[in-house]
Structure formats: C-alpha cells, structure tokens
Amino acid sequence: MDEVVYIPPQTKEEIECCMINLENFININTSDFCDLDPLIKLAIIHHQFESIHPFYDGNGRTGRILCVLYLVTNDLIDLPILYLSRYITHNKSKYYDLIQCIRDNEGNNEKDWQNWILFMLKGLEQTSKETVLLIQNIKIPWMSTRLKFGKNLEQSIAMNF
C-alpha cells in the first residue's frame, strides 16, 4: 500500500481560500509587489497550484498550462508553445521530491525553494531550446518547399482549406 505523503486542502472553503490567495498572487504586478523576477514567480505559482490540488483529476495538466498562460500574459513568450510536460515527465521523481521538500518544511526552508526554482528555470531553459530547434526543423523544409513551388503551393493550400 502506498504511503500518503501529502494531503491537500480538503474542504470547499479551504480550497477556495487557497485559490483566491493564488489568484491574487498571480495578478499582483510584480514591480508593485517586490523585485521578484517573473520566472521565479512562475515557479512559485506552479508549486502553489500543485499543492492546492483543487481538482480530482487533471491538476498536473492544469498546472502546466497555467505556466504557459502566465508566460503569455506577462509577455515572456508571444504564443503558447512552450510546454514543460516532457521535462517534468523525464524528471518526475525529482519534480515530486522538490515539491514535497517545500511542503515538509511548510515553505520555510530557503534552500528548498532555491532548489525548486532552479529546477523550474532549468526546465524552462531546456524546453525553450527544444522548442526553438523544433520550429527550425519545421521552418527550413517549409521555406524550401515554398521557394520550390511558390504561388502554386499557396494557391493549393488555400483551395484545400
């Protein structure tokens, strides 16, 4: 039998209070709040959402999409194309261990937060590089095909869609 390592807020009132607190934190203008870098704030937001665990299912997916939406909303990326899912999946046990370390110390250990934030920053960096490479691998053949077929390709695409 698996050991329960964390019990998230249980009652509707607890969850609602935590979500309101998180929503307020997300919407506070960072420059008004303190000198908190938006990427560090993103790591804190993600941890807090995962700890609130407001849904029966889908918290992980929702937490990851929340990261992407935060990046877009804060003009850190133009389009919602940066997904941390692969990074988190490949580093799943470290991801959960780091989240749990913060919970175990009730968020009071600065080193736990530092390790978590560095993990998330590394994930953002790695995912960004992979995304740029993927776009380049799509763009180069597309441009080559476009040059080869020119307007005929554009007309064919327009007629088929």
Task: List where the protein language model places each region.
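FIC/Doc superfamily catalytic core
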Residues: 1-161
